[in-house]
Amino acid sequence: PEALGHERIHQLEATAVANAEQALSTDGPEEQRFFLVGYTPTQFWLDHYPLTTLLGHTGQHLEAAVVATFLPSEVVDSLYAVMQKAGLEVASMTLEPIAALNAAIPADLRLLNLALVDIGAGTSDIAVCRDGSVVGYTMATVAGDEITEALMRACLVDFPTAEAMKLELGRSKSVSFTDILGLEQTLPAEELFSLLDGPIQALADEIAQRICQVNGGPPSAVFLAGGGSKLP
């Protein structure tokens, strides 16, 4: 028999994705449309034996498992509309944690049980890999904005000022700002960090909980990306 090539493997993956799409359309509301925005093969089987890749192998019975992500059509349409207004065309689309993990964690390191967390402004996107494959994605709805809002309340400043203070915290021993009363103040970075202990701990706890949920327990290591990851 002929050895398995890229085309046959892609066909197998496409079948798995099509099955996922069929299951989603069957279980979801009839009026809701979803679009595939990314998928990652998590495991292959050749004649019922698990493999990380089928390329170059021969066998009779092939199976593939994938993690496929679908977004509501309204979200995808909005993204395309923004690109069109900017005079650009969409060549491909993927999820932030997929892109971040592919960029930050080499394929040979994905044999380890690792998690990558991209802490942005509004959400913290999480991807988990083990045994050579990406095995799951999830998202925590807490991120850098929670820290900014905590600074607003603690120091009586507006959002842009709090955002600038947050950025300065990682670079300086003291932070100067003007509060909403027009008073100029300078506080030691350590004092500001003490004010943020609660929100930072809550952010860390939520992310840790999400990682353990999608991974089934603590991973061997966690990689951090995004601006929010610069917080201590």
Model-derived features: positions:
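Glycine-rich beta-strand-to-loop/alpha-helix junction loops that act as flexible
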Residues: S220-S229
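A general structural motif
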Residues: P199-A208
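Conserved ATP-utilizing enzyme core subdomain
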Residues: V142, E149-D179
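Nucleotide/phosphate-binding catalytic cleft detector across ATP-hydrolyzing
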Residues: P1-L114, G144, R171-S194, V214-A221
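Active-site proximal loops enriched in glycine and acidic residues that flank catalytic Cys/His/Asp
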Residues: V128-R130, T138-M139, I211, G226-G227
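Short glycine-rich, Thr/Ser-proximal phosphate-binding strand/loop in the N-terminal lobe
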Residues: P1-A3, S133-L151, C155
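Gly/Thr-rich phosphate-binding beta-strand-loop-beta motif of the actin/hexokinase/Hsp70
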Residues: P106-G136, L151
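Residue-level signature of catalytic and energy-coupling elements of molecular machines
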Residues: M83, D118, L151, I207, ...
